[in-house]
C-alpha cells in the first residue's frame, strides 16, 4: 500500500496483484482505479502488484499482462491516465519485481536488472540503468535502512549506495554468497 494526499485529503491505495488498485479515504470509502477510454494509456492497471507515489504521480507496475511496464497517472490524480494531461507508460527490458522511492527517484527492481527513474513529469522522466548484471529475488525484500536501499539478490543481500556525487549510485554486497 501507499499513502498520499493529492487534494488535501489523506488517502491510501492498495494493490494486490489481482484486482484493480483500490483507494481508501479517511472515511474508508473505497474507489477502484482503472484505465480505459479515449486519450488514456492503453494498458490497464488492473492486476498491479506495486504502487508508489513520486513527484505527485501515481506509478503502477507488476501487471501480469505487461510485467515489464510501468504506468503513471497525471499529476495529482491517481486514477486519470489521459496521455495529453501528463500520464504515460514506460517499458523496461526485464520483469519488474518491485518499486521503491529513494532520494526523489523511483528505483525499479527487476529479476536481472535495476533501473532508476528520475525527473518530475512526463516531459523529463528519464530511465537510467543502475545495473544490468544483477536483480532482485523478491520485491518484498527491498528496504530502506541507514540511508541506503537493501535488497535480496541471487548472491545475497546487496545495497544500492548513493555516493557523494549527485545522481550516482553503486552496488555493494553486505553478506556472504548465498
Q: Where does each model-flagged region fall?
A:
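Beta-sheet-dominated scaffold domains
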Residues: 3-7, 12, 56-57, 65, ...
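N-terminal beta-propeller domains
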Residues: 34-116
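Disordered, low-complexity "stalk" and linker segments at domain junctions of extracellular
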Residues: 1-55, 59
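Surface-exposed loop/turn elements that mediate protein-protein interactions on large endomembrane-trafficking
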Residues: 20-36, 66-88, 115-126, 158-174
Amino acid at each position: 500500500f501507499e499513502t498520499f494526499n493529492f487534494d488535501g485529503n489523506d488517502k491510501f491505495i492498495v494493490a494486490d496483484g489481482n484486482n484493480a488498485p483500490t483507494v481508501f479515504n479517511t472515511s474508508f470509502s473505497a474507489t477502484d482505479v482503472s484505465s480505459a477510454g479515449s486519450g488514456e494509456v492503453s494498458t490497464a492497471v488492473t492486476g498491479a502488484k506495486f504502487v508508489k507515489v513520486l513527484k505527485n504521480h501515481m506509478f503502477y507496475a507488476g501487471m501480469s499482462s505487461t510485467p515489464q511496464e510501468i504506468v503513471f497517472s497525471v499529476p495529482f490524480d491517481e486514477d486519470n491516465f489521459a496521455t495529453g494531461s501528463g500520464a504515460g507508460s514506460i517499458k523496461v527490458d526485464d520483469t519488474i519485481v518491485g518499486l521503491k522511492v529513494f532520494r526523489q527517484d523511483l528505483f525499479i527492481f527487476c529479476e536481472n536488472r535495476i533501473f532508476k527513474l528520475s525527473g518530475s513529469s512526463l516531459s523529463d522522466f528519464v530511465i537510467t540503468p543502475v545495473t544490468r548484471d544483477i536483480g532482485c529475488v523478491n520485491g518484498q525484500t527491498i528496504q530502506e535502512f541507514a540511508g541506503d536501499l537493501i535488497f535480496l539478490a541471487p548472491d545475497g543481500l546487496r545495497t544500492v549506495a548513493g555516493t557523494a556525487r549527485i545522481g550516482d549510485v553503486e552496488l555493494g554486497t553486505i553478506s556472504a554468497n548465498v
